[in-house]
Swiss-Prot record:
Binding-site positions, substrate: 506
Pfam families: Aldedh
Taxonomic source organism: Danio rerio (Zebrafish)
Enzyme superclass (EC): oxidoreductase
Chief localisation class: mitochondrion
Keyword Signal: no
Function statement: Irreversible conversion of delta-1-pyrroline-5-carboxylate (P5C), derived either from proline or ornithine, to glutamate. This is a necessary step in the pathway interconnecting the urea and tricarboxylic acid cycles.
Protein name in UniProt: Delta-1-pyrroline-5-carboxylate dehydrogenase, mitochondrial
EC number in record: 1.2.1.88
Length: 556
């Protein structure tokens, strides 16, 4: 997938000679896993090899595998009697040891040419694309409860694309150089940050964990990677692939840990240079506050980047294509059980179209299969991730039953006897300000507000002001004037904004992802500028003509 085109010349730029190189990569194709296909046979074999087994996963500091006494287990969401992985939490002393070892390794890694670092990630991408694809997918399916297609788009193409495109952007960044002047040359050196980066990963995307740790490392940084407890198996597989691809020891430390212990330890280190985070708003705020409280101890101001979820909307105009609305909303709201940061959870429908859309949603709803994604590939989505998530969503379903403003029109049941299963649920609200339209649920729950069709301008204002989040949103008008009007009204309501398409499904290099407001710092991983976030540029001016006169001409 990598093709480098070298330009005809090389130019001397201060301390370095820069080759003008353009790197061509393409998005990794999504495989279909049809009956009888090679990829399906390989995946089924990988799933059989993991069935009923418990993987042992240590903390890894440098080349040392370390076990502590604080033992934990990752459970399969759809069969919580299956312990997918046995792992341990790093304690404060071990985390500090990891920091010390990382900082000691930083200088040599940072001085390595970016092209050499990039080749490690190109190789890792090729390994995931080829021989390790089935293994990483199988571990994502069993450990995180994903269906075949959801595991595929996450743990294969998205992760592969992160590695390849970020490597491409890192190499091409070297060509972004300042102007020279007569008698001198100017060079921009893209250094890593001075210190270490703490990467805090979520459960819902194997690719995000790999990117949170991988991109800072690619740019010359050393990283402490705290994987999610509920994505441990797939995360460890990605870590091992990076090491197999040539990543030196101590560049990424693999350190499962209790969240508060990890946060307290990294934010109290003078060497903290950055935090790369995906998770909840309360956790991100806690980390940010700890950084603020400790500013006086740091050698540098830490870079803090975070993505925190959303309360994503679908706005339907009276000119909408009904079938597109129904299909897009079902997929956005219920794929992976609504556990995507971009999932649609609030919908605004004009009264003139609601009967059609309602019936369309219910017709599809009856066909949705929720179950074991390993035993039945026709499953549309599986269980939610763990008992905490199940309890939280169950609480929202109970709220929907008791609220006078809410009516459950489909689903509403849940069962955690074998797995953490929640039915896809559609709720109608008569109050657009009801808290279910404001707060993130992170489950298969869609709430619909039906509005008078001529009040769509008021509804656009309502969408923009109802929720503190601003991650993704979609509008469904065929009327071009409404598309333009909505774009202005919702300019700040979503970092990823879709027109006549669902609010999920961003692709690396096509729709760089992220939002503002309570949704995060909107650094747009998957885009060309993301790598710059993890550099500390140095400008070097080298003068070739001796300076012989201290007086300025006007002084003559």
């Amino acid at each position: 997938m990598l093709r480098a085109r070298s330009a005809v010349s090389q130019s001397w730029k201060g301390f370095k000679t820069f080759s003008c190189v353009a790197v061509e990569v393409k998005n990794e194709p999504v495989l279909e896993f049809k009956e009888g296909s090679k990829e399906r046979a390989e995946l089924e074999e990988a799933l059989r090899n993991l069935k009923g087994k418990t993987e042992e996963i240590p903390c890894v500091i440098g080349n040392e595998e370390v076990w502590t006494k604080d033992i934990r287990f990752q459970l399969s969401p759809f069969n919580h009697s299956h312990q997918v992985a046995k792992f341990c939490y790093a304690d404060k002393d071990l985390l500090n040891k990891a920091i010390e070892a990382s900082v000691a390794a930083r200088r040599e890694w940072d001085l390595k040419p970016v092209s050499d670092r990039a080749q490690i990630f190109f190789k890792a991408a090729d390994i995931i694309s080829g021989p390790k694809r089935a293994e990483v997918l199988a571990k994502t399916m069993i450990g995180q409860g994903k269906t075949v297609v959801q595991a595929e788009i996450d743990a294969a193409p998205e992760l592969i694309d992160f590695f390849r495109f970020n490597a491409k952007h890192a190499i091409e960044l070297e060509d972004q150089q300042p102007l020279d002047s007569d008698g001198s040359t100017n060079t921009m050196l893209y250094r890593g940050l001075e210190g270490f980066v703490a990467a805090v990963a979520p459960f819902n995307f194997t690719a995000i964990g790999g990117n949170l740790a991988g991109t800072p490392a690619l740019m010359g940084n050393v990283v402490l990677w705290k994987p999610s407890d509920t994505a441990m198996s797939a995360s460890y597989a990605v870590y091992k692939i990076l090491r197999e691809s040539g990543l030196p020891p101590n560049i990424i430390q693999f350190v499962p840990a209790d969240g508060p212990v990890f946060g307290d330890t990294v934010t109290s280190s003078e060497h903290l240079a950055g935090i790369n985070f995906t998770g909840s708003v309360p956790t991100f705020k806690r980390l940010w506050k700890q950084v603020a409280q400790n500013l006086d101890i740091y050698k540098n101001f830490p870079r803090v980047a975070g993505e925190c979820g959303g309360k994503n909307f679908h706005f339907v105009h009276k000119s909408a294509d009904v079938r597109s609305v129904v299909t897009g909303t079902i997929r956005s709201a219920f794929e992976y059980g609504g556990q995507k940061c971009s999932a649609c959870s609030r919908m605004y429908v004009p009264d003139s179209l609601w009967p059609q859309i309602r019936q369309g949603l219910l017709d599809v709803y009856k066909q949705i299969k929720v179950g074991d994604p390993v035993e039945d590939f026709s499953t549309f989505f599986s269980a939610v991730i763990d008992d905490k998530s199940f309890s939280r969503i169950k609480g929202w379903l109970e709220h929907a039953r008791s609220s006078p403003h809410l009516k459950i029109i489909a689903g509403g049941n849940c069962d955690d006897k074998k797995g953490y299963f929640v039915e896809p649920t559609i709720i109608e609200t008569t109050d657009p300000q009801e808290k279910i339209m404001n707060e993130e649920i992170f489950g298969p729950v869609l709430t619909v507000y039906v509005y008078p069709e001529n009040d769509y301008k008021k509804v656009l204002h309502l969408i923009d002001n109802t929720s503190p989040y601003a991650l993704t949103g979609a509008i469904f008008p065929q009327d071009k004037s409404v598309i333009e009007e909505a774009g202005k009204a919702l300019r700040n309501a979503a970092g990823n904004y879709y027109i006549n398409d669902k609010s999920t499904g961003s692709i690396v290099a096509q729709q760089p992802f992220g939002g503002a407001r309570a949704s995060g710092t909107n650094d747009k991983p998957g885009g060309p500028h993301y790598v710059l976030r993890w550099t500390s540029p140095q400008v070097v001016k080298q003068t070739h003509v001796p300076l012989t006169e201290w007086k300025y001409p006007y002084m003559s």
